[in-house]
Design a protein with these regions (language model features):
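Residue-level recognition of conserved structural "scaffold" positions that shape functional pockets
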Residues: 8-11, 33, 141, 147
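Catalytic core of membrane glycerolipid acyltransferases/transacylases, capturing the structured
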Residues: 89, 122-178
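Membrane-anchoring hydrophobic helices of lipid-metabolizing enzymes
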Residues: 17-130, 164-169
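Short, positively charged and aromatic/hydrophobic N-terminal segments
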Residues: 6, 10-18
Length: 178
């Protein structure tokens, strides 16, 4: 609405950059969403290792964080963190652009659903607390399909506004809300 109009009238460069980024993100997300999950995970392995070598500051931060957590990090463990982080990132397009029914089929084993079912049967409320690393968007989509009511997720919007719009479009469909 009005905010978009203000951007267009007062700062055409910002509007053009936002539009370009939105189109670019949407294009690549749709491309990745069409790929088999196994291929995305293999790609994540390669990209995660590349990021490990290219991002010295991030690599050092992971080593420091692991030491702070009382772990003895080695190169293999830190590379695994990068691979898993990229894997989670490459799963986002799947969560945002595939049909919920096809996402549901990706889950081959679910542990602990009996606790959710017991709470539902007892008429109790539910609060899911999930880590911010991993397949939380895929899991949220899966859970929202199985619940008899909408699933509302809270999150901190990304700094890149175009990415937030793509995320909202992907999360707020079916029985998902933010």
């Amino acid at each position: 609405g009005i905010d978009c109009l203000r951007i267009r009238l007062y700062n055409p460069t910002t509007f053009l950059w936002y539009t370009f980024m939105y189109i670019l993100i949407t294009f690549f997300f749709k491309l990745f969403a069409a790929m088999p999950l196994r291929l995305l995970h293999a790609l994540a392995g390669v990209l995660g290792c590349a990021v490990y070598y290219l991002r010295r500051e991030d690599r050092e931060r992971v080593f420091d964080n692991m030491r702070t957590a009382g772990l003895q990090p080695d190169e293999a463990a830190v590379k695994a963190v990068f691979r898993e982080t990229v894997k989670g990132g490459l799963e986002l397009p799947v969560a945002f652009f595939r049909r919920p029914e096809s996402i549901e089929k990706l889950f081959v084993e679910v542990r602990g659903w009996e606790h959710v079912q017991a709470a539902l049967d007892a008429g109790e409320g539910l609060l899911f607390i999930t880590p911010h690393i991993g397949s939380y968007d895929l899991a949220g989509r899966y859970i929202s399909q199985r619940l008899p009511f909408p699933l509302t997720a809270m999150y901190k919007p990304p700094k890149l506004k175009a990415m937030d719009e793509v995320m909202q479009a992907g999360r707020v469909r079916g029985k998902g809300k933010t």
